[in-house]
Structures are given as structure tokens and as C-alpha cells.
């Protein structure tokens, strides 16, 4: 029954504007007894406009979640290559390192936290990478990834955009409703940001991707690789 609630609620959300992440009143966050309403709170953090290497132009997003803010000073980036290990606590896949963030944050703060680690939100360059990394995310919860759909392109462009170039076609991902269409997968003018849900069930099809308001407090995944490091310097 618990699995059924996780699977059905987002469908309703996609058809009737936007609801909260599909967690019921009987669930708690991370077993700590924290009320699930925490996930429905709006984060006061606001995404930045200062990282020019991002493909995103936040002025094209029809939401106050994307406004200019002051940004912390950049730290010297750390290169990643095949012969080196990832920092403690990071996962390794090919030439990238990944951080599974278990602090609940709005999209903006998640993006900033990744940047402070000389990384971006997770951008999948292959389906193998996508399946491998999201399998390490926290079960029964959503994690922000580096994927948004701009309001400005609502009529001319169906696909969301990744935070960096060279990523997989988003339609190939495990969206809740297939074939991919933005509206039925939760997108509205104020639900621009994509999150990945990892089901506690062993059935792979129970995990999915869905759009939510960027101010929802979710977990997140950071990625650091040599390409990103070179651009950030």
C-alpha cells in the first residue's frame, strides 16, 4: 500500500497542477520523526545567474525561485582523472565523482552546495551512468538533478535542458508517464525542476523522474568531472 501511494500521487499532481512530493502523513523523513510537511516547505534560497558555463538562463523561467543572489567565492577546483580516487564519501563512475546529498534542500541551495564542492548537479551522459548513479540515491525519496524545463520555451520546446552539454536525451529517462510529455510528468510554469525518485521496491520501473516546484526540499546528487573542472577554472 505504501508503494502504491508513492506511485499514484505524482500522476494526480501532473494532471492537477502541482502537489507535494508523494509522501503521506504516515511517513517520516529519514526515520527521525520529522513531519513530512518539511518537504512541502519553501526554501528561501534562490538560484544564481553567475555561472556562465551553465546552459540555463534563469530569466526564461516563469518562477520567482530563480532570481539573482550573491554567491560564495570560488574554491580552487580539484581535477578528476582515471588514475585518481574520488574524495572520501564520493562515488566513482568512469571519469566522474558523485556526492549523494542527504540534506533536504530547495533546488537553489542544492545547486549552490554542489558548486561549493567544485561540481554541478548530476548530469547523465549515458543511460548506464544514469542507472548506476541514481541507484545509490536514498530510497523512497526524491533527489534533485541538473535538469530543468524553461517556461519561455513552453510552446516551442518540449524537452527540458541539462545543466551542462553532452548529456543524454531526456526522453530516454525513466519518466513516470511514458512516452515523455512535460505536463503529465508534473511540469507547470512553477514546477520547472526535475527530481529522481528511487523506489524501495525491487521493481526498477517503480523508480521514476518527475517535475516539482524548485522550492521543494529534497535530496540531491552532485557530479564532479574533469570537463566541469576545466570550465570552472
Swiss-Prot record:
Domain (C-type lectin): residue spans on this chain: 93-223
Keyword Phosphoprotein recorded: no
Keyword Translocase: no
One Gene Ontology term of the molecular function aspect: carbohydrate binding
Cysteine-cysteine disulfides: 114-222, 193-214
Record-linked InterPro entries: C-type_lectin-like, C-type_lectin-like/link_sf, C-type_Lectin_Receptor_IMM, CTDL_fold
Alphabetical UniProt keywords: Disulfide bond, Glycoprotein, Lectin, Proteoglycan, Signal
Secretion signal, residue range per the UniProt entry: 1-20
Any Gene Ontology CC annotation: external side of plasma membrane
Glycosylation: residue positions: 26, 32, 81, 225
Gene3D superfamilies assigned: Mannose-Binding Protein A, subunit A (3.10.100.10)
BP-aspect Gene Ontology terms: immune response
PROSITE patterns per record: C_TYPE_LECTIN_2 (PS50041)
SUPFAM superfamilies: C-type lectin-like (SSF56436)
Name this protein carries in UniProt: C-type lectin domain-containing protein 87
The organism of origin for this protein: Caenorhabditis briggsae
Amino acid at each position: 500500500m505504501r508503494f502504491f501511494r508513492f506511485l499514484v500521487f505524482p500522476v494526480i499532481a501532473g494532471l492537477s497542477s502541482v502537489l507535494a512530493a508523494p509522501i503521506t502523513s504516515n511517513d517520516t523523513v529519514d526515520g527521525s520523526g520529522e513531519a513530512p510537511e518539511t518537504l512541502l516547505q519553501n526554501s528561501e534560497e534562490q538560484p544564481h545567474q553567475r555561472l556562465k558555463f551553465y546552459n540555463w538562463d534563469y530569466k526564461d523561467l516563469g518562477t520567482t525561485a530563480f532570481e539573482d543572489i550573491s554567491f560564495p567565492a570560488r574554491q580552487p577546483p580539484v581535477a578528476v582523472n582515471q588514475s585518481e580516487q574520488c574524495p572520501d564519501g564520493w562515488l566513482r563512475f568512469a571519469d566522474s565523482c558523485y556526492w549523494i546529498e542527504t540534506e533536504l534542500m530547495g533546488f537553489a541551495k542544492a545547486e549552490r552546495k554542489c558548486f561549493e564542492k567544485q561540481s554541478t548537479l548530476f548530469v547523465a551522459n549515458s543511460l548506464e551512468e544514469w542507472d548506476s548513479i541514481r541507484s545509490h540515491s536514498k530510497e523512497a525519496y526524491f533527489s534533485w538533478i541538473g535538469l530543468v524545463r524553461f517556461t519561455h520555451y513552453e510552446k516551442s520546446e518540449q524537452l527540458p535542458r541539462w545543466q551542462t552539454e553532452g548529456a543524454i536525451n531526456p526522453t530516454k529517462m525513466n519518466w513516470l508517464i511514458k512516452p515523455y510529455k512535460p505536463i503529465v510528468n508534473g511540469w507547470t510554469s512553477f514546477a520547472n525542476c526535475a527530481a529522481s525518485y528511487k523506489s524501495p521496491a525491487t521493481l526498477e520501473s517503480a523508480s521514476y523522474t518527475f517535475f516539482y516546484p524548485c522550492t521543494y526540499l529534497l535530496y540531491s546528487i552532485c557530479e564532479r568531472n574533469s570537463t566541469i573542472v576545466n570550465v570552472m577554472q
